[in-house]
């Protein structure tokens, strides 16, 4: 990690804070502010972390915002991430060579594969410069949000292996410190680590070995969140990107971790013990609720004498995970295209927090082609977690040019082109009535369809008209120049939103899309309105299609809507 910090410094991407800063909220708050600066943001190195409540000073500095912008991401990759995506695309399209030059190029490609698999070192070869810590309390573990249940490791590389040791997995899971030598393992039900857990448990075993690494090459933690197919070790991707194998050293529990890790925590998950984990302010921008999760017993902690503790803060976008997700989006496009050949491009808007909204451009060749691809998306790996997807044709503007793209989509909007489905969803999703399972919606905006022309009113007149039927606070129309403006409505909910929508259908000649939100939202901030809407809706419950009009209930839910979980 020290080597990468030097690289950040040389590229003017590092800000060093010498003053003592508290691990309880303060470090995370400063990192949050810095991350909001976008491409102007820098990584932050806190040289003197402290805990005021415990009257404690830590010896290990804290690095935040490692992936502060696209330049930092490329520095971690050692090259442009777009170059990696192009290389994957060419690899997938390899064909039998005919000319001598093509044969040589093919041979050189094959030779480069020898550096992909990790290299295992002899036992403890790299541990000579490590010291043994007595407990987790010696690490500057952060509390990032006021209502978090405690301190969490937020950039831990969690290494596991299956029962017969034929598969290895690297995942990035938050880890709540529940005692001085105990962590709570937030394994989501769909993740490989959780699958290994059930292998051990079904075999009647009591323990499952787990090791956690922190720091080292920053590409390790990026690889940990890469959506690779089940059974593929994430560090193979490291070898492909860097063209050099990861060097792994064994822990005493049999798990291998990178030799240059700054901190290594090894132990085991007790297969019979669970404790309440959370709440935690997560990347969705909401607190995830307290739930039972497995307990990891820490047996040994190693740390370099000059170790750097790497951490991150997640919450309302945009934050550091935006940059990490950008690399993922670009690099996995060629792989996704193998399952969806007519996919031209896709984009995960940051305010859609990855799994809540995806935009896709396709080469639409026949009726219902977009619907066919919707089903493909919802059945491919981690794409299956996506709640909402909008598809446009190959002539659409760039998927990142929202000012041009959104009117283009609205000119092609038709309620008959909306597909409502259901399936698995991210365990962090709070809107669905059931954990891990809920509604999905796809919109086919590939073809311009003739629809009746609306009589568009000014916002004030439309609000006055609507108030004759429903008690509203305010409204704002977006993209009034398009065929289907979006009308966002603020209200203090007095009845089910569907009832309010039904009443407003009397004025349907003035609108095609109504979105209902709670009073605390700001109509001037369209970025956060999108974030709120895609977070707060379950498509099967909250989307109403009547008389060729669309209603969306993005308000908080409760018993009236059949929602029995705790709304965050």
Where are these regions (language model features)?
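Extended, highly charged
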Residues: 1-280, 284-295, 299-568
């Amino acid at each position: 990690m020290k080597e990468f910090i030097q690289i950040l410094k040389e590229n003017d991407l590092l800000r060093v804070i010498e003053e003592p800063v508290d691990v309880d909220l303060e470090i995370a708050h400063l990192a949050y502010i810095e991350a909001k600066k976008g491409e102007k943001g820098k990584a932050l190195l806190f040289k003197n972390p402290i805990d005021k409540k415990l009257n404690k000073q830590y010896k290990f500095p804290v690095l935040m915002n490692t992936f502060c912008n696209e330049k930092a991401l490329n520095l971690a990759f050692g090259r442009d991430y777009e170059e990696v995506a192009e290389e994957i695309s060419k690899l997938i399209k390899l064909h039998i060579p005919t000319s001598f030059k093509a044969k040589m190029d093919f041979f050189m490609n094959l030779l480069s594969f020898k550096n992909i698999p990790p290299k295992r070192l002899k036992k403890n070869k790299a541990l000579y410069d490590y010291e043994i810590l007595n407990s987790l309390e010696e690490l500057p573990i952060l509390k990032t949000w006021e209502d978090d249940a405690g301190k969490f490791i937020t950039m831990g590389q969690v290494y596991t292996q299956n029962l017969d040791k034929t598969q290895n997995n690297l995942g990035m899971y938050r880890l709540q410190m529940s005692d001085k030598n105990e962590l709570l393992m937030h394994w989501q039900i769909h993740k490989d680590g959780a699958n290994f857990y059930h292998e051990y448990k079904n075999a009647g075993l009591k323990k499952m070995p787990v090791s956690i690494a922190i720091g080292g090459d920053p590409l390790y933690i990026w690889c940990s969140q890469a959506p690779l197919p089940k059974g593929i070790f994430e560090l193979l991707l490291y070898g492909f990107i860097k063209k050099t194998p990861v060097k792994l050293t064994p822990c005493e529990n049999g798990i291998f971790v990178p030799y240059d890790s700054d901190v290594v925590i090894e132990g085991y998950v007790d297969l019979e013990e669970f404790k309440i984990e959370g709440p935690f302010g997560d990347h969705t921008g909401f607190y995830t609720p307290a739930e039972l999760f497995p307990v990891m017993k820490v047996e040994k902690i190693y740390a370099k004498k000059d170790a750097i503790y790497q951490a991150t803060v997640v919450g309302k976008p945009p934050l550091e995970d935006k940059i990490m997700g950008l690399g993922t989006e670009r690099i996995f496009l060629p792989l996704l295209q193998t399952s969806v050949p007519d996919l031209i491009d896709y984009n995960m808007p940051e305010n859609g927090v990855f799994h809540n909204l995806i935009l896709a451009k396709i080469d639409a060749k026949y009726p219902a082609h977009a619907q066919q691809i919707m089903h493909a998306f919802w059945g491919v790996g981690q794409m299956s977690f996506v709640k909402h997807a909008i598809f446009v044709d190959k002539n659409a503007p760039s998927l990142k040019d929202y000012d041009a793209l959104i009117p283009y989509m609205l000119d092609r909007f038709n309620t008959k082109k909306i597909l409502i489905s259901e399936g698995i969803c991210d365990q962090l999703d709070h809107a669905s009535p059931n954990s891990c399972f809920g509604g999905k919606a796809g919109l086919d905006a590939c073809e311009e369809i003739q629809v009746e022309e609306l009589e568009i009113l000014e916002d004030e007149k439309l609000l006055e008209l609507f108030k004759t039927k429903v008690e509203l606070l305010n409204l704002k129309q977006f993209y009034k120049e398009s065929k289907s403006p979006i009308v966002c409505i603020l209200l203090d909910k007095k009845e089910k939103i569907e009832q309010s929508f039904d009443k407003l259908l009397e004025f349907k000649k003035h609108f095609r899309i109504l979105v209902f939100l709670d009073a605390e939202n700001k109509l001037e901030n369209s970025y956060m309105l999108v974030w709120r809407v895609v977070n707060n809706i379950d498509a099967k419950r909250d989307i109403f299609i009547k008389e060729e009009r669309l209603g969306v209930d993005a308000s908080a839910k409760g018993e009236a809507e059949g929602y029995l979980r705790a709304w965050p």
